[in-house]
């Protein structure tokens, strides 16, 4: 319907807020409980925007029903300029694109908006994509879906120690198949109007009509940090779509004082990633994880979520020497 023609960041925040308020009316046992918001990728916009709306609506309320405490985002779009700089740097430093393309990307794109790129930026992005080849951009070191028929996976299991156990690059294909089953749509009370086209994981109809997408979330970060809201940002370091370097440049632009300097955090005596605690924000990286961290590193992701909820920095090894 007309909803498809008027989407945007602002509408998404207000729709989500209306959903939360109505959901709490339906399930009142959850009213007044500590409430956190988390998301990844473009939810780097949705999560801070919804957080800001909840925070502002709670102002002056002594006992808010939506008892908002903090948010967490992963491999998140944060600030278009710094994200572009960090993304192109990641592609080049990880050997995905040529020197020439790297320079041209910097010239053509860095002052564009992520949602509305110029023609020149689009063009050179296509060149970059061709240079990268058929890799999984969301997880640059793991096989792509086409190659992992069950037969092949059995063959390579023993020979490739870097292939994460249990990661299946074909999840998107499965969900596309699943959500197009008539009985599934019926159970969801979806597609009651009999839409002639298939459900897709990423809809062009939506992105083509997207109305508003601010270039930066940093002003919201500043507002919520000042209000004492807990903010954690995490990043899987094998993602080239919203890579760690993009996140680091964006966070650096906040100029927050450091509380605990960069250190490795551990899971079962292995380095699981790195962590830096700033005043008002904690940054955690997850080693070897792609764009969707819990999909690639479920055990480490669980540890991350537990520490976020307890507001405890990520674990160091028992014998670690404090060198800073």
Curated annotation (Swiss-Prot):
PROSITE patterns: CARBOXYPEPT_SER_HIS, CARBOXYPEPT_SER_SER. Disulfide bonds join 109-121, 145-170. The keyword Glycoprotein applies. Keywords: Carboxypeptidase, Disulfide bond, Glycoprotein, Hydrolase, Protease, Zymogen. The keyword Disulfide bond applies. One of its GO terms (biological process) is proteolysis. The linker peptide is endoproteolytically excised during enzyme maturation. Residues 150-162 form a propeptide. GO terms for molecular function: serine-type carboxypeptidase activity. This is Serine carboxypeptidase II-1. It comes from Hordeum vulgare. The gene is CXP;2-1.
């Amino acid at each position: 319907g007309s909803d498809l023609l008027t989407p945007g960041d602002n509408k998404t925040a207000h729709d989500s807020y209306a959903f939360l308020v109505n959901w709490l009316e339906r399930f009142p046992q959850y009213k007044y409980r500590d409430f956190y918001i988390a998301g990844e990728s473009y939810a780097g916009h949705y999560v801070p925007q919804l957080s800001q709306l909840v925070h502002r609506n709670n102002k002056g309320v002594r006992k808010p029903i939506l008892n908002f405490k903090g948010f967490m985002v992963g491999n998140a779009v944060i600030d278009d300029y710094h994200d572009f700089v960090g993304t192109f740097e990641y592609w080049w430093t990880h050997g995905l694109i040529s020197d020439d393309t790297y320079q041209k990307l910097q010239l053509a794109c860095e002052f564009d908006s992520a949602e509305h790129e110029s023609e020149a930026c689009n063009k050179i992005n296509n060149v970059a994509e061709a240079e990268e080849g058929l890799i999984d951009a969301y997880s640059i070191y793991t096989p792509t879906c086409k190659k992992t028929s069950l037969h092949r996976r059995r063959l390579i299991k023993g020979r490739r120690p870097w292939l994460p156990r249990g990661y299946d690059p074909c999840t998107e294909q499965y969900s596309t198949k699943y959500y197009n089953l008539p009985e599934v749509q019926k159970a969801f009370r979806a597609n009651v109007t009999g839409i002639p086209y298939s459900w897709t994981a990423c809809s062009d109809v939506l992105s083509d009509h997207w109305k508003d997408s601010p270039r930066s979330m940093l002003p919201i970060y500043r507002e919520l940090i000042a209000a004492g809201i807990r903010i954690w940002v995490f990043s899987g370091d094998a993602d080239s779509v919203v890579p760690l370097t993009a996140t680091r440049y964006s966070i650096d632009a906040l100029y927050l004082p450091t509380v605990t300097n960069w250190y490795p955090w551990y899971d079962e005596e292995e380095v699981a990633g790195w962590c830096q605690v700033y005043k008002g924000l904690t940054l955690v990286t997850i080693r070897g994880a792609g764009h969707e961290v819990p999909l690639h590193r479920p055990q480490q992701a669980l540890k991350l979520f537990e520490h976020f909820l307890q507001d405890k920095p990520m674990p160091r090894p028992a014998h670690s020497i404090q060198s800073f």
